[in-house]
Amino acid sequence: MIPFNPVEALSNLISIRSFSKEEEPARNLIESILTTYEISFTIDLNNIWAKNKHFDSSKHTILLNSHLDTVKPNKGYTKDPFYPHSENGKLYGLGSNDAGGALVTLLGTFLHFHNEKDLPFNLVFAASAEEEISGKNGMEFLFSRLPKIDFAIVGEPTLLDIAIAEKGLMVLDCKSIGKSAHAARNEGVNAIYEAINDINWFSSYVFPKQSDETGTVNMTVTQVKSGSQHNVVPSECDFVVDVRINDKYSNNEVLNIIKSNVKCEVSARSTRLNSSGISSNHPIRIVAEKLNINTYGSPTLSDQSLMPCESVKMGPGDSARSHTADEFIYIDELEQAIPKYIAVLTQLGEELMVS
């Protein structure tokens, strides 16, 4: 069997347009690789997944997951986003860093373990859709169709460090209500002033529960809209708040605290993108310590938020490069990733056997 080449696989992936909801051609590439290695797989919409050959339902099952979709290229690109171009140790192309590098190296890791007998765990590899838009037909659709998952490694660019916690997200649509009047008459109730009081609360309130990994809950007002003309006191003021929730709160808990402290109407677009974290005694913490891998809390969102199991985030590449013009990943990052994943899973297997 031809050895798996992650650089070649990623180059092929880059050359395929795979925007959210348009992942089928990229999914077909993963299908062709699994077919080459004679591995059975299941297709669910634009998602594809496979189990290790000697799957045993009595064992713990670990999910290896990353996403097929990319954002659309921005106007700052100077290179063809769909042409995999190597230069000075870098592989350029849309999705190379977020998260094609993680996807192909997790696939390579799965191929390494697939045929092994007597693994101390099961492995499921899943290439999922719609991560970039937190869509309904990606991991949210797929997870219930997988075997029971005990733990997940989600492939995202982390410099191959391990993110042991991740902030959740809520977007709030807020509306302050006033009473319109002629601006010259010093009458009415100015909805903008009403909104300012609540906006000041959003900017200054500190949630009491702090996290060692993800810090505090952050609330940022990102949009404000009010008024129709210069001489009318506005009766409504709409504003949007971006809320990043640490792993000490659920989204609903934070939403209830907000509603009890502000006067404006508050509506959450969604409460499903919760924070994630692992228990203080989880074996992956011991693995990271033994392998001298840095751990941290991530402020950015991934499909972890849609997984009702403990999970970490780990992968080649740098989150700072995600969604940037002329996106790239270092080739040596790809070369280091599979051995690092293998070491983590091997050590994790030893810890599971001890526990």
Model features per residue range: what roles?
Residues 164, 173-355:
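Metal-dependent amide/peptide-bond hydrolase catalytic core
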Residues 1-73, 236-240, 254-257, 331-342:
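N-terminal helical capping/dimerization or prosegment-like subdomains
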Residues 11, 31, 104-107, 111, ...:
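Predominant activation on well-ordered alpha-helical scaffold segments within soluble catalytic domains
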Residues 99, 103-171, 175, 211, ...:
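Acidic/histidine-rich catalytic neighborhood of metal-dependent amide-processing enzymes
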Residues 62-64, 126, 151-153, 312-314:
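Hydrophobic/aromatic beta-strand patches that form the interior of the parallel beta-sheet core
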Residues 59-124:
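Active-site metal-coordination/substrate-binding segment of hydrolases
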